[in-house]
Design a protein with these regions (language model features):
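Short, well-structured alpha-helical segments
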Residues: 215-227
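Conserved H-loop
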Residues: 213-216, 279
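Alpha-helical transmembrane bundle of multi-pass membrane proteins
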Residues: 1-201, 205-208, 227-452
């Protein structure tokens, strides 16, 4: 494919990741002001204010594959932008915690669907040699959105007085509207047109405009993969025994992604840093360092993913997780101070960006056959969001300075996450296959042959 057109389509679609990332951590700046405004209890605050968007992502991820298969990738990407926009305006203008939670839920549905459809779309238009980097653009935009949200929260703190949190949340409407308009400029996935619409003429037209050297050969390869899907997997579905290994791989990578504690740290970064001894505004500023580190090392992950491969990056990340989380736990346990703690929080973020952060959406999007890719992506994404929601829900019960179980010394939380990363390291060594540099159709044959 012509690099310029391929990259342009990928960048547009990956902007959904920017909104995903921004929305993920913007709540960290609004967390304390909302708690003080509506006098929420730790349990209510955890369920309605902090994790309601994540329950929306679970719903969106779980069922997002259905419209993605029926309506096509492009239409669903467009609706994702509409959901983002409605959520941004709704949360900024909400006058009670229930209405606020409703609009956070709407935005979460959009994020959940985007985590299904965006990686699928990019993986289907990419070539085998560029697929890792291009799908990882989605992850890059997630971390770029995270950084921009931290900067925005810091810049808007105090702006509008007690209503600064409304500006923090409402500013998301700008990229949401821009993304929605840009989606009109992309083409539909040729693989979807062939496998679901049998529209070979339109698919060939798109492949030709994108610069595919041998259009007929590309179409034949897609048709061959589609034929294999039908002949080998007529009882299509994730419960088919042929797919057990694929389902297990998607489950485990999503499970370990959240059991690293990444969303816990991103959602509660200012509060964690305050407990380490930083003032509120200093904690918001240091959150920017977390976002910046995430962005820089995501570049490293993007550079390495198609060179070293997915499995190697997961191994590197696992070792970094274990070291950093163990030392963060020690920092809280021994009261070493904010500088020591911050250093190893940044090491944790770097390990995540190079490892799980760079790999998860690429890996899930490429391991499933074309005809169940939407369902597989939905499954993996929903597992990711279920555990993200559960962790975010229970965090105030453990972390709250006044009523939390650990109050101002949450070292056992980080020790638990470190232990989970030891298990991830063992799993990667023993179970994870390498997928770099292989066409989706060849990868399907490789993984299913091992399963059988």
């Amino acid at each position: 494919m012509k690099n310029s057109l391929l990259v342009r389509w990928s960048i547009v679609v990956s902007l959904a990741g920017f909104i995903f990332g921004f929305d993920t951590v913007v709540i960290s700046g609004a967390n304390q002001p909302i708690k003080e405004l509506w006098h929420t209890s730790p349990i209510f605050h955890g369920f309605f204010i902090m994790s309601m968007a994540l329950w929306g992502t679970v719903l969106g991820a779980l069922f997002g594959g259905i419209p993605t298969q029926i309506w096509g990738r492009k239409k669903v990407l467009l609706w994702v932008g509409i959901l983002f926009t409605v959520s941004a305006f709704g949360t900024a203008l909400a006058n009670d915690p229930y209405l606020f939670s409703f609009f956070r839920f709407i935005g979460g549905v959009g994020i959940g669907i985007s985590s299904v459809v965006a990686p699928i779309y990019i993986s289907e238009i990419a070539t085998p040699t560029t697929r890792g980097r291009l799908v990882a653009l989605y992850q890059f935009n997630i971390v770029f959105g995270i950084l921009v949200a931290f900067v925005s929260n810091y810049a808007l703190a105090g702006f509008g007085g007690d209503n600064d949190w409304r500006w923090m949340l409402g500013v998301l409407a700008i990229p949401s509207i821009l993304y929605t308009l840009l989606v009109f400029s992309i083409a539909e996935s040729p693989r979807w047109l062939i496998t679901k619409q049998n529209n070979l003429a339109k698919a060939k037209e798109i492949l030709l405009s994108a610069g595919v050297a041998n259009v007929d050969e590309a179409v034949e390869e897609i048709l061959s993969g589609s034929s294999n899907d039908e002949s080998q997997q007529s009882s299509v579905g994730l419960l088919n025994k042929k797919h057990r290994r694929l389902v297990a791989l998607a489950f485990m990578i999503a499970f370990f992604n959240q059991l690293s504690g990444i969303n816990f740290i991103l959602y509660y970064a200012p509060e964690i840093l305050e407990q380490a001894g930083l003032a509120t505004r200093d904690s918001l500023f240091n959150s920017i360092a977390i976002g910046s580190t995430n962005l820089v090392f995501t570049f490293v992950g993007l550079y390495l993913i198609d060179r070293l491969g997915r499995k190697t990056l997961l191994l590197i990340g696992s070792i970094g997780y274990i070291i950093s989380l163990s030392l963060v736990a020690y920092a809280f346990y021994a009261h070493t101070g904010p500088v020591f703690l911050m250093s190893f929080l940044l090491l944790f973020i770097a390990a995540h960006a190079i490892g799980q952060g760079a790999v998860i959406w690429v890996f899930i999007s490429e391991i499933f056959p074309t005809r169940i890719r939407s369902a597989g992506q939905s499954f993996g994404a929903s597992i990711h969001w279920v555990f993200a929601a559960l962790i975010t829900l229970v965090t105030p019960v453990f972390l709250d300075k006044e009523n939390g179980i650990f109050k101002e010394n949450p070292w056992p939380i980080f020790a638990f996450f470190a232990g989970m990363m030891v298990l991830q390291l063992i799993w990667v060594l023993m179970r994870v296959p390498e997928t770099k540099g292989i066409s989706l159709e060849e990868l399907e044959k490789k993984l299913l042959s091992k399963e059988s």
